[in-house]
Amino acid sequence: LDLGYVAFYAVGAYVYALLASPHFGIHLPFWVILPIGAAIACLFGMLLGAPTLKLRGDYLAIVTLGFGEIIRIFLNNLNAPINVTNGAQGITLIDPIRIGDFSFAETSTLLGLQISGPQKYYFFLVALAIVVIIVNVRLQDSRIGRAWQAIREDEVAAKACGINTRNIKLLAFAMGASFGGI
């Protein structure tokens, strides 16, 4: 039970905010930042997963919950001596998501209906969630997914079958973190 997903979500959000705002003067497009944010969240997932591989149940939940809290406090206090996250005020003036000339922040008309910026973001995030669900279903039916299921059912038997449980569990942490970072 991993309760640290809020930390991976925060890492992905701050990567986007830092790379798509005037805070550092970098204005990269969303499609460039998305894999960068997922990769950095994946790195944080491996950093959390490596020391916690032997924990189970309540102990794993407590450690991952603590990790989420550590990341929150760290990001809130990362404004001195170098202002990276602007502290509790956060990063402002983040660029809206654009696909070509189509901006998700502006109201537009489609088939005579007015679609506001928040509605466009909603439909975009639903589409992104559907893509993530499809990827997860495909992963579940793959060799890696079967290894995850074998480890869940009986870790000793999975080891006896030749599954490298340490690497597969670390991959599970990393993949979950990357999806959280998206």
Question: For the regions a protein language model found, what residue spans apply to each?
Answer:
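Transmembrane alpha-helices and adjacent helix-loop boundaries
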Residues: 1-182
